[in-house]
Amino acid sequence: VSAWVGLAELALSGCTTSTDHLYLHPRGGGDLLSAEIAAAVYLGMRFHPTRGSMSLSEKDGGLPPDDVVQDDDTILAESEVAVARHHDRSHGAMVRVALAPCSPFSVTRDLMVRSAELAEKLDVRLHTHFAENAEDDDFSLAMFGCRPFEYLRDVGWLSDRTWVAHCVMPNDTEIAELGRAGIGAAHCPSSNLILASGIAPVTALRRAGVHVGLGVDGSSSADSASLWLEARQAMLLAKLRDGAAAADARMALEMATIGGAGCLGRVGEIGSIQVGAVGDVAVWSLEGPRFAGAIADPREAWLRCGPVGARDTIVHGRFVVRDGRLTSPRVAEMLTTHRRLAARMQNPG
């Protein structure tokens, strides 16, 4: 239900393809990856979930409690099963799976190395948190004796099958190396603002050849699953960091479309309207008082005059949102169920 609600909110914002970094697998929690894939299939969203993992608990010097971590062998075995069960390699696939240790600080070095090897063997993508804030730099230097970028390189992750979350703190040399490696970065502007993590150097990353897409992050650090909002925040933060002329709506739109496709290794297949691409389209109405007079540049009007939801969101030729409403027949039922479960979790007494 939670996955359905999050994906539904994304669809209403014009998102056609999403991923999820599912790295908590509580004991007795069931097959959560299959459950969220089922939610995406039911809604009609294109989905790239990751089989995430955490292997260092509190007793090992990590952050999570013991009951949500797994040992390396179990993680890798279940990752291979998930890929075999769900990963569709065909053109226009609606479901693909990536491997995603949570972060270099919540898994063993061996798991990072073996995950990269398994991704190579299975020909799937890799994802992890990277250089999110200054604390990450400090922790990496103290724990590994090197910066996060150097650690990523040392464990075999500096490849064009990798995309990372955040990428707030790389220096100029590292940005150039990330670009040469063909790495992707999911820029999460709202989350970075809420947590005061900093502003990712997206202009420099894009200039270096890094595929920069957008992430809405999760409910623990961002409260709106809106791709449109993240595009607007990305544009404004790039202006704040690098000057008013550093970003515009076209740049933000590219991050929300082609940049995301690059992160997922699907340039020319999704994220663009061209011969050979799938039928994914978001349609926006530029009518009404908020757009009055906004005629000269529809792209700037789209991003500056909102906030607005998509009029239509079409995935693989099928309407997921039509006339601003979800086409799913069970919207009210799903929201009622979600509200009941959320209330029970937040008020267990």
Predicted regions: what they are:
Residues P26-V168:
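Metal-coordinating catalytic core of metallo-dependent amide/deamination hydrolases
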Residues V1-S34:
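Metal-associated gating/positioning segment near the N- to mid-region
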Residues D154-R161, T203-G288, R304-C305:
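His/Asp/Glu-enriched, well-ordered alpha-helical/loop segment
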Residues G14, A40, L99, H129, ...:
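Divalent metal-coordination and catalytic microenvironments
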Residues V278-L335:
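C-terminal cap of metal-dependent C-N hydrolases
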Residues K59-D60, A134-C146, D172-G179, A196-L205, ...:
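Histidine/acidic-residue-rich catalytic or RNA/ligand-binding cores of hydrolases
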Residues T162-P170, H187-N192:
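Catalytic beta/alpha-barrel core
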Residues G44-R46, A116-R125, W157-D160, E177-A186, ...:
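Glycine-enriched alpha-helix->loop->beta-strand junction motifs that scaffold or abut catalytic
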